Amino acid sequence: MSYESIFRHRGESYDFAMKKFPWVRDKEFQQLFSKIPLGKNEMILDIPALGGYLQKYCIENTVICLDFSKSINGIDVVSPYGKWPVKPVDRIVCLAAAHHIDDLYLFFNNMCDHLIENGIIHLADVALDSPISKFLDEFVGSNTSTGSHNGNYYDWNDVKYPTDLKVVNIENRPCPWIFESEHQMAEYCRFLFDLKNVKDKQILDALSNFVGYKNKEKCILNWNLTYIDLQSIRAKPASS
């Protein structure tokens, strides 16, 4: 199922989870810039942005939000492969959405079109054959309101990238989700993935079996993603 179809139905539930527990995925967002830190006054395109959650991690920069699905906000809706209503930006961020993109090569090429020369793409997503991919496709897919979750996962070292993009980093990084309790973790996942007709224990068992977590002073879910940094080496035409 496409990103547009999924979040047209599940966007409100996802946004509720992100806004009720806004700290849970701090590590996931912070890891985006761990290898190439942000400067000041950079223009950053967050796509797909859904509820615009990136802005609080980029307080000295301007974040432009676009999305692929009309759901919970007034953010402009665009195609992954078409012209976007923005001037070339310094950086583009795509977090945890690439596994819903059908033509990754075209998407990368389009992102390159919207970068300044030497601009950076920061992409992070679930790895091929990882425990998290199995959690999403098997448990979430069996219990979400949209009826399935069949992600397009990749070994990012084997992906064909446009020749105008230089691979700077490809790295699996831990980005644990942090909760106050098991109950909070189950509630968060219930809304984030719009899980229906499942009890907290079923969610916790699935998280334990697929992903793993520790429950001591904090409840820490062992989330991790592959982080990819790409740099545009496409020469921009000189101004006339």
How would you name each of these model-derived features?
Residues 21-25, 49-53, 152-157, 163-240:
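Conserved Class I S-adenosyl-L-methionine
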Residues 82-92:
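A short acidic, Gly/Pro-enriched loop at the edge of an enzyme's catalytic core
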Residues 90-105:
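A short SAM/SAH-binding and catalytic strip from SAM-dependent methyltransferases
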Residues 37-43:
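Short helix-loop-beta connector
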Residues 45-84:
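Class I SAM-dependent methyltransferase SAM/SAH-binding core
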Residues 105-120:
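A short glycine-rich, Lys/Arg-flanked "PGG" loop and its adjoining helix->strand segment in the class I
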Residues 1-37, 53-54, 122-149:
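Conserved class I S-adenosyl-L-methionine
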